[in-house]
Amino acid sequence: MSSTPFTIAPSIPTELDGFRVEIDVARERADVVLDRPPFNIISMPQRDQLRVTFEALDADDRIRVIVLRANGEHFSSGGEIKGFLDASPEHVARLAWNIAAPARCGKPVIAANRGYCFGVGFEISLACDFRLASETCLYALPEQRLGQIPGSGGSARLQKMVGITRTKDIVMRSRRISGKQAYDWGVATACVADDKLEGEIDALVEELRGFSSLAQRTAKKLLNDTEDASLSTAIELEGHCYSRLRTSDDFREGVDAFQQKRKPNFRGS
């Protein structure tokens, strides 16, 4: 007798190492909060748990937007140094995959950055869709000071954003850049006063909730998938995605709402 294959949805680990998860069903929002004060150092086991958590939140239909933030005045000063030496080769091989979890989410992910945002803290922020930085924020990939290089996708993602010259300046000199500099270079989505950061995050969450979740997922996947594509390939894929969305309920609702001069009621289908 054959059985029908099925997939078990991932679940958030019951005992979290160095972070917590807050879910606000009414606002369709989940917050992943780094919580190992004062510097919110990220351990090796924590990286695995963060990946599983993002996968679980992505599969949770109650959630529309995910926010990655931290407790205290620093987002994260980076990884646990001892963990680098103790980690198995198999664990090290998963570093970039774990930290890329926000990018693989179909839902929009926002990073709220303040204070130190170094090493893996910077790398996981780079994997998010939006980086809102406070004026206190300092970004850095300081691995050269340890005789190493970034190992979780930081230099690769940064080079795509700012080019090889600025990436060498940041990586090879272990240079710190401010939130304002990151905004000017296109690394940060916005740079705001520190006491305005939470308000800006809240406003962005509400803005994103107002769009079709289907259109949001489609746009994110298209942009991620075409990052390394030629212009002609990217245009072709964009056309395919556009054509598919033309048959969606949300597109019809959006057109009707526009013509009727009312707010659309998107349902994600």
Residue ranges and their predicted role:
Residues 92-99, 205, 223, 235-238, ...:
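Hydrophobic alpha-helical core bundles mediating ligand binding, dimerization, or RNAP-core interactions
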Residues 2-34, 175-209, 217-226, 254, ...:
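Amphipathic alpha-helical segments at domain termini/boundaries
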Residues 47-49, 62, 69-104, 117, ...:
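Glycine- (often His-adjacent) and acidic-residue-rich active-site loop
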